[in-house]
């Protein structure tokens, strides 16, 4: 009698699994719990309520952004195309650091000097054909003295030639959404069609600061030497000695561009980027950057984002060999940009399903975290799966069923 009941139980369970799998296959996505946020969703830019004043800026174009969120805090003619002089070297530096991150170069890699690099005009360290420096030394020359010959030598190392490297520069600019930028060379000398905007410069600057923070090791150097002390390097960014919290980033001056700067600064966890293009003099360039940064630090603050203490660390998964999937809250920023006078408390509200349906892939968005200041929504960020949970195959299900039945019979 017991053997008959066991056989009937087995037959019933097998039929159930066959029906469930067949139904799931026929219905496809209809059986699966849909994520609250679509997969790979981008964090929303924070909503800010501060009305910026009319600043007096002695330049053709300017923009001030929060480095962490990308929020625009002030802008003036930010989409007007114009030459950007040696600020071009920010893209040269970005591609170089990315080559280092990819393992193609190290800071000890020897950088040869070609005839082409030797003939660069403008600011330089007077490289000689056949002379070699390490990449570390060349980066100092670019970041501190804005050396055009060093920038071209590095571009040739990374891209094979300057024209090939310029193609990489334009491709990377397109990837970053720099819609009004076209590069014609790696150093920023005035060339027809070599144009950008204050907004695009801010995008480029934010990218290198967020993804290659080691650039600040070089942009923060005030003085250094090369050739065993024979060549003196003095930083062209005088704000390093004049402005509290300045960290970089790059100056630029040509006849076509005027006097320019993209300046990065940090105070009390608030990281700002001020871009000034087309100032009539170096003095007015630094004055404009100072005005922008002073406004930003006075009008805004960086508030720590509190993660809910009782947040779920994992979610249950149906139809998988994995019972649960761990959750990744890394998209939530550590700090949030708030108006300085804001008295509201930051909170995080989570929207997550009770369970997930397999398959689940690592990095898939499974919910969202809403950042609030009082009742005002400051931003929304994806909550992602931190591991895979593959869909259980029919054979695996039968094996698990058989093992469980054998255990029950024993």
Model-derived segments and spans:
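Active-site-adjacent loops and short helices of periplasmic peptidoglycan-processing enzymes
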Residues: 2-5, 26-212
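Sec-dependent N-terminal signal peptides of Gram-positive bacterial secreted proteins and lipoproteins
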Residues: 4-27
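Generic alpha-helix initiation/capping and coil-helix boundary signal
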Residues: 13-15, 166, 282
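Short, compositionally biased leader-like segments
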Residues: 20-41, 329-344
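Domain-terminus/edge residues, biased toward the C-terminal soluble/receptor-binding domains
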Residues: 178-182, 190-195, 199-410
């Amino acid at each position: 009698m017991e053997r008959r009941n066991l056989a009937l139980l087995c037959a019933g369970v097998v039929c159930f699994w066959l029906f469930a799998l067949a139904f799931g296959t026929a219905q496809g996505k209809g059986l699966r719990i849909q994520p609250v946020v679509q997969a790979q969703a981008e964090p929303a830019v924070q909503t800010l309520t501060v009305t910026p004043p009319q600043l007096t800026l002695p330049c053709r174009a300017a923009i001030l952004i929060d480095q962490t969120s990308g929020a625009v805090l002030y802008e003036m003619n930010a989409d007007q195309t114009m030459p950007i002089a040696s600020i071009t070297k920010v893209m040269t530096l970005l591609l170089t650091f990315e080559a280092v991150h990819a393992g193609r170069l190290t800071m000890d890699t020897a950088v040869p000097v070609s005839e082409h690099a030797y003939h660069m005009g403008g600011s330089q360290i007077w490289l000689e054909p056949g002379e070699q420096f390490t990449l570390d030394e060349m980066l100092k020359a670019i970041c501190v003295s804005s050396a055009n010959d060093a920038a071209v030598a590095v571009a040739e190392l990374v891209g094979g030639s300057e024209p090939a490297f310029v193609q990489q520069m334009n491709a990377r600019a397109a990837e970053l959404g720099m819609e009004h930028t076209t590069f014609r060379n790696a150093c920023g000398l005035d060339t027809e069609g070599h144009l950008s905007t204050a907004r695009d410069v801010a995008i480029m600057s934010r990218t290198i600061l967020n993804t290659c923070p080691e650039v600040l090791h070089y942009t923060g150097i005030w003085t250094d030497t090369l050739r065993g002390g024979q060549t003196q390097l003095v930083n062209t960014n005088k704000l390093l000695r004049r402005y509290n919290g300045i960290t970089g980033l790059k100056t630029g001056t040509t006849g076509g561009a005027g006097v320019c700067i993209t300046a990065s600064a940090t105070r009390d966890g608030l990281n700002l980027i001020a871009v000034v293009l087309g100032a009539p003099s170096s003095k007015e360039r630094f004055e404009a950057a100072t005005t922008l940064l002073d406004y930003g630090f006075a009008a805004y603050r960086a508030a720590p984002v509190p993660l809910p203490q009782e947040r779920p660390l994992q979610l249950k998964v149906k139809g998988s060999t994995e019972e649960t999937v761990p959750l990744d809250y890394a998209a939530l920023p550590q700090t949030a940009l708030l108006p300085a006078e804001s008295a509201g408390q930051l909170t995080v509200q989570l929207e997550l399903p009770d369970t997930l349906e397999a398959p689940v892939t690592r990095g898939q968005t499974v919910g969202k975290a809403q950042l609030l200041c009082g009742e005002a929504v400051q931003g929304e960020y994806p909550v992602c799966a931190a591991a895979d949970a593959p869909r259980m195959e029919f054979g695996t299900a039968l094996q698990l069923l058989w093992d469980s039945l054998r255990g029950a019979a024993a």
